[in-house]
C-alpha cells in the first residue's frame, strides 16, 4: 500500500491488481465502505478538495525476495542434464557460460510444460523440445517463461512466451538480478543479457520503452548490430535524440548480436565500454554506422 496525494492505493505484486483504498474496502466490506466515505467527506479528505496532506508519513511496505521455484513439471535444469545431451551441446556451441546454464531449463515437451505451469492458458503450443528461459520480477516471483526452439524442434515459432500472471506489464528478463543504483545495460535478447553484468533483456527492439520502465539514473541502450534494418536505425536515432547512452558498433564488428560476437571471439565488454556515446558524438558515430 502507498500514498499519493491525499489518497491511499493498494497494489498486489502477486496478481497485478491495483486500486485505491476506497475501492478495496468496498470489495471486502460494502457496509464499512459507506462509513469510510462519510468519514472522508466529513473531514474534507476528498480527492476533489483542497485538503492539506496529513502531517504523518505512512511507511512504504517492505517486500523481501522470495525463494525461486526449484522444481517444474515436465522440465529439468540444464545443469543437471548428462554431458552429451543435445541441449547441453546446443548451449556449449553457443558459448553459454556456466552461470547462464544454471538459470535455464530443458523440456522435452513444451506444451506439457506450459499446460502444467499455467492450466487453461489458451495458447496454441507445439509439443516440441525447448530450452526454457524463466522470467522473474524483482521479488524473484516467476512472471513468465520463454521456450527457445532447439535443433530438432518445429521452427514455426523460434520463441514461444507464456505469462504466469495476469499483469499487462512488459516482460523484461533480468529484473531479479539488476542493481538500479549502478549502470544498467539494456539489450534486445535475454540470452545476450546473460553475457553482461547488470543487464536486462527487453525481449524485442523497443529498448526505449524498456528503459522508461527501469528506475535507474544511468542506462545504456545496446541495440543489435543491424545498420541496414530501417526499424533498428530509426529506434537508435530516436534514442540518441532522447539523449540516452547508446552503443554504436564499430565497423570491425560483422556479427548481429552479442551472442554471435562472443562466438566469434570478440571482447564484447570492452567493445561496449569503448563505443558507448551520447549527444552530438553519438549522432556523428551513428551517421557513420547506418547503411540505410
Q: Would you name each region that the model predicts?
A:
Residues 1-27, 120-127:
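N-terminal single-stranded DNA-binding subdomain of primase/primase-helicase replication proteins
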Residues 28-131, 139, 178, 242, ...:
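TOPRIM metal-binding catalytic domain and adjacent DNA-binding surface shared by DnaG-type primases
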Residues 48, 78, 142, 156-159, ...:
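Generic secondary-structure boundary/loop-capping signal
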